C-alpha cells in the first residue's frame, strides 16, 4: 500500500514554506511602508503674530489680505504686498525677537503692523507679486499689480523708478528677475503671455513675448532659475509648466504636464528639480531633465485661491497655505504633510470660505533651524520657528 501521507508530505512542506515566505514579505512590505510614512524631524512653534489690530482676536481687516511675502537676499528684511495697496518693509529681528535667546517656546509675541513695520510705500493698485532685484543691495523692489503694470521702487528714496505696461491692463500675477542677467525681468499675466523686459529700457519694445502653449490661457507664475543660467519656468491656466531658455524662446525646453487644474506657483528646489502648486489641491515635485513627476503632495485645501508656495532648499522642506486657514509643511521625501498649524482666526460658514492662508516664505538660512513666515487673507503675519529634533 502506498503511503499517501508520505507522498504528499514534501508538497505540504512546500506550502508551509511558501506561506512563511509570504508572511515574511508582508512584514517587510509593512516595515517599508512604515519607513516611507512621513515623519516630522522638526519641532515647530508659532513665535510672532503681526495683525492689523492691537489684538489678535480683533475683527480681521478684509481689505488687508496679504498676497505675497519676500525675504531680501540677506534674509534680514521682509517685504509684503497685497490688497491694501501698500508695500510694507519689516526688519526681521524686530519680528523675531526670540532669535538666539532663551525663552518660553509657548510664548507668542503679538504686534500690529503700524508699529512693527519700518515703513511702507503706497502703490497705485492692488499687488499680486513683489520681488527683490538681484545685485541691488536690497535697494530695489519690483512689483506686479492688478492693473497690469510692472513697477520698480527705490526703497531708499521710497519712489517708483521704473514702470512698464506690457499686458494691456490685464492683471499681472507674477514677476521675477533673472539671476543670470539681473537687468532682465519677466512678468506673467491674465493676457496669456509672459513678457521679458530689460529694466534699463522703460519704454519701447520688450525683449520677448512668450505665449505658452500657443493659447490665451493666463500665465499665473514665473520664476527664473535662482542658481543662475538662462532658464525661466512658467506656470499656466492650461495646467502645465513650461521651461524656456531666454536666449531662444520660440519653443520650450521642457513641459511638465500632470496637474488637473491651473498651475498657480512654480519654484526651483535645485538646478533641475522644481515644485509646482495647483488649484487641483496638490503640489508636485518634478525632474525637469526628463519631465517626470517625482512625487505628489496632498493634505492642504486648494481649489480656487492663491495660497502661496515656498521651498526651503537647505532643509528640503516645502511650505504652503490652505483654504481652511492652515499652514502646511511637507518634507520633499514624503507625500503627506509633516506639520500643520491652524490659525486662531475663524474660517467661513462653509468651512473654508472665510479666512485662508494666502502667502508663505521660508528664510533661506541654516540647516538645523528654519523660519517660515505666513500671511493671511485677514492681513495677519505669522512667524514660525523650527528646530531639528536631536
What residue spans do the PLM features occupy?
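Intrinsically disordered terminal extensions that flank WD40 beta-propeller domains
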Residues: 1-64, 72, 93, 387
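A structural motif specific to WD40 beta-propellers
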Residues: 47, 98-100, 116-118, 138, ...
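WD40/WD-repeat beta-propeller blade N-cap
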Residues: 52-65, 120-127, 165-172, 210-219, ...
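Loop/turn segments within WD40 beta-propeller blades
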Residues: 70-75, 130-138, 175-183, 222-229, ...
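Conserved strand-to-loop turn within each blade of WD40 beta-propeller repeats
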Residues: 81-84, 143-147, 187-191, 199, ...
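WD40-repeat beta-propellers
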Residues: 87-93, 144, 150-154, 175, ...
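Blade-loop segments of beta-propeller domains
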Residues: 101-132
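Blade-level signature of beta-propeller repeat domains, shared across WD40, Kelch, NHL, RCC1
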Residues: 358-390
